[in-house]
């Protein structure tokens, strides 16, 4: 699929913050390069919340790209239905499934982090925490909507293909019957009785 998700670990230690991932995490680059205004790594909880924010934001950006790609494939499918476009839609649907799974897991992790007694949430973090919750919830809802729309679109195109096949079968049946009539007539007159 064009998009995929990877696990990410963030370790808060007294000496600093460590992030571990199986692949490139380009969404973290603004945090690591210091391009996020007002970010302090002194409070590890703030950094963790910013990571969640960046994750949700990256998913929303990816969702916009997926929606644009789906729209392009939809326009192609309106002209002619080929396997290439249908497979492209399937790839996008897989990506949306990965997004939804990852976002829901992130929401669950965020809820669990709030209950960890050893993490000391500063008052400043509470507003950011609420913002991150809203951003994650919005991303989850938008991905779910996009997934439903894509599923409905694929069902509609499947119905179109089925209708087209039915029309072709009707024509072929009619042609077969028409071609069978001369054979039937010749068979009747050609019998030796």
Model region roles, listed by residue range:
Residues 1-122, 128-131, 135-142:
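Peripheral, non-transmembrane regulatory/ligand-interaction domains of membrane transport proteins
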Residues 134-193:
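Hydrophobic alpha-helical transmembrane segments and their immediately adjacent juxtamembrane loops
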